[in-house]
Amino acid sequence: MADQAYEPRLKTVYRERIRAAMKEQFGYTNEMQIPKLDKIVLNMGIGEAVADSKKAQTALKDLQAIAGQKPVATKARKSIAGFKLREGMVVGAKVTLRKDRMYEFLDRLVTIALPRVKDFRGLNGKSFDGRGNYAMGLKEHLVFPEINYDQIEQIWGMDIIVCTTAKSDQEAKALLKEFQFPFVN
């Protein structure tokens, strides 16, 4: 039997095809100059669940199912009376994905989740931060196959931030296009 370790599909594609395409397109002289994915951060704001801790727990459970690892609950830093918010209350959840889990999530996002979004026309190609990172938002988390539609109590939105080692937005956009991100502009 072969003792071959599992490697995510997109990681193999990056190693075998994308690196060469990026090197050719931008004329890098050193292999270490070629941009790569650094991490993907998933953030879910659950402000409506402040009063109900059960809703917060279901949101954390859903994010764990989507990401494949346990999320960190983000807490309020200070009290705001107008929002009935006290310091230390859970107001969101976040997960940072790296290495193989990052590539697996990206594969599910591009091939399964984005095509399932209602009225999806493509991603905004101008949502880069100037340092090679891309941020996008989803209005509902139901587009992921890990979520059972029948057992959902509430629909949550989420932010997805893709961090790369690219030095410019142009390099980062070229990298994400190679990963089949459906940019409109």
Curated annotation (Swiss-Prot):
GO MF annotation terms: rRNA binding; structural constituent of ribosome; tRNA binding
Q: Which GO terms describe its biological process?
A: translation
GO cellular component term, pick one: ribosome
| RNA-binding keyword on record | yes
* Superkingdom of origin: Bacteria
UniProt keyword terms in alphabetical order: Ribonucleoprotein, Ribosomal protein, RNA-binding, rRNA-binding, tRNA-binding
* PROSITE patterns membership: RIBOSOMAL_L5
The record's annotation in InterPro entries points to: Ribosomal_uL5, Ribosomal_uL5_bac-type, Ribosomal_uL5_C, Ribosomal_uL5_CS, Ribosomal_uL5_dom_sf, Ribosomal_uL5_N
Asked whether the UniProt record includes Coiled coil among its keywords, one would answer no
* SUPFAM superfamilies documented for this protein: RL5-like
Subunit architecture? Part of the 50S ribosomal subunit; part of the 5S rRNA/L5/L18/L25 subcomplex. Contacts the 5S rRNA and the P site tRNA. Forms a bridge to the 30S subunit in the 70S ribosome.
NCBIfam families referenced in this protein's UniProt entry, alphabetically: PRK00010.1
Family membership noted in the UniProt record: Belongs to the universal ribosomal protein uL5 family.
State its role.
Answer: This is one of the proteins that bind and probably mediate the attachment of the 5S RNA into the large ribosomal subunit, where it forms part of the central protuberance. In the 70S ribosome it contacts protein S13 of the 30S subunit (bridge B1b), connecting the 2 subunits; this bridge is implicated in subunit movement. Contacts the P site tRNA; the 5S rRNA and some of its associated proteins might help stabilize positioning of ribosome-bound tRNAs.
Name used for this protein in its record: Large ribosomal subunit protein uL5
